[in-house]
């Protein structure tokens, strides 16, 4: 099973992925957790280029780098793991491309769909958990985590984190539009709930999905 987590930066994905992976391992499942961009030697190098704040990358260049990283991850790690019967949990997948590069950067959505199909080989998650939070609240969380003042020009932020509030508002709208188009694949969760409450919702939803597949 392929499980993906989506949401704007600061929504709490990493915490929930860790908790879900621990739960599934206790249930006897073999679990592999991965992140995008990253997950292979080549993809991790691409991640460094993408997030390094001193790099000035065009929207199309950014898109192609994300796509290259994804192609490596899917081919080298994700598909082999799924073939071995493992449960793969991905911190971001192609929905991030649509939301961030499509809605956030304003790139053509049809072009994105073509690149997504090429980079994933049409691989689609069995379920996607979307943690929804207002950009204003998410960014306060991110700045607080890094003990930084609320200023987007701060050099301690990575390149994506410095994109600004309006960018993240567009990204969130992108996610909402994606979910409206594919409601069956998504479970949208209010990220303002407590950590344990969100985890309980995820576990309940996933167990129901396991039953459907058995």
Swiss-Prot record:
GO terms for molecular function: ATP binding; dTMP kinase activity. PROSITE patterns: THYMIDYLATE_KINASE. Its EC number is 2.7.4.9. Keywords: ATP-binding, Kinase, Nucleotide biosynthesis, Nucleotide-binding, Transferase. ATP binds at residues 7-14. It comes from the Bacteria. It catalyses: dTMP + ATP = dTDP + ADP. Belongs to the thymidylate kinase family. PANTHER family: THYMIDYLATE KINASE, UMP-CMP KINASE 2, MITOCHONDRIAL. NCBIfam families: DTMP_kinase (TIGR00041). Phosphorylation of dTMP to form dTDP in both de novo and salvage pathways of dTTP synthesis. This is Thymidylate kinase. It comes from Chlorobium luteolum (strain DSM 273 / BCRC 81028 / 2530) (Pelodictyon luteolum). The lineage of its organism: Bacteria, Pseudomonadati, Chlorobiota, Chlorobiia, Chlorobiales.
